[in-house]
Amino acid sequence: DLWWLKQVAPMAEYFPTHILKVSMAWSVSKCKYSFQKMMSMLEPLSKVDIIDQMRVAYEYFPMENKDVDFQFPVLILVGKKDSTGKVKTYCKEWAKRTGYPLHYIKGAKHFSNGDNPEQVNKEIEDFINRIIRKERK
């Protein structure tokens, strides 16, 4: 897996800038709103900026965060239709290994808060309320 992650940034260099941005936006978006929002976030970035961010996300992040132990409550949300790499697989394994709750966002890809904001907000609200109730006991 790590070898493939290191290939993402070099492969992106072969894409024309506009095609790179459009393909990235659609790959994480299920609905038009999310696509447009993602395009607006990518718009000010140059191809070099995007590739630098890919390098951080795909090459460095997995190594730097492999043994992280959070000392606060964690909720894992993942789009039911997320097809970004192995995100769903990794989230499932992370939840299994740590006991963190994992919730799937219906009809959503990787940009799940844009694809289904109602469910994302409800999941977060319910999570916070469970923590508050637990602390009051």
Model-identified regions with their sequence ranges:
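Disordered, low-complexity tails and leader-like regions
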Residues: L2-L5, S40-L45, F61, V74, ...
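Low-complexity, flexible helical/coil segments
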Residues: F15-S29, T89-E93, H110-D115, K137
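Conserved loop-alpha-helix segment in the C-terminal half of the alpha/beta-hydrolase fold
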Residues: V74-A108, G114
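Long, low-complexity, intrinsically disordered polar/charged segments
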Residues: Y58, E64-K86, N121-N129
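Conserved alpha/beta-hydrolase catalytic His-Asp/Glu region
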Residues: E13-Q71
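Flexible "cap/lid" loop of the alpha/beta hydrolase fold
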Residues: D1-F15
